[in-house]
Amino acid sequence: MTAVNAPVSGASRFPLRMAVFGVLAAGVVLVLVERGYRELEVQLAGAILRVVTSSGVYVAGNRESVYFGLSGDTPFGLRMTPECSSVFLLLPLLLVTAALLWFRPQNARRLFFSLGISAIAVILVNQLRILTIVGLVNGLGTDEGYYWGHTLLGSLVSVIGGAISLVLFVWLATRKTKAEKRAAA
């Protein structure tokens, strides 16, 4: 048995083109508002740190910075720079979504679902990276803790978490439902 795709008329491709354009536009908007995005990321980091630590946390959103350990002897601040933000880790997910939307428009709902889940995973991975840095600074001290937390373990968390998020996205976007598996059998 051979599967043949029916030709799609220009009128019915318009929503598809708009969806692809919307996903690409979301990527452009994220790049344009990355500073505001970083401020939100720092606010989220501050909220998480307030829950997991009692040593005092202050967020300077306008400086994209979070300070912790304020009640101790060695308070420390982290500034969220563009390369440390999850905003640029979201861009590959948006590009893959746009490409898959273009070539597999019938999977639009599944693609948007997988984009949402994977985007949340990327954001949480970056928060885990920040928590790793904070934990190591608290445990090993400022110099060694920051070195190990930011340079080595933080980078590993980002790379491995980003890869897992991308694999999760592709798996969610391309897997078949039970009904599709039964129909194919």
Predicted feature residues:
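Hydrophobic N-terminal alpha-helices or hydrophobic patches in metabolic proteins across all domains
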Residues: 1-185
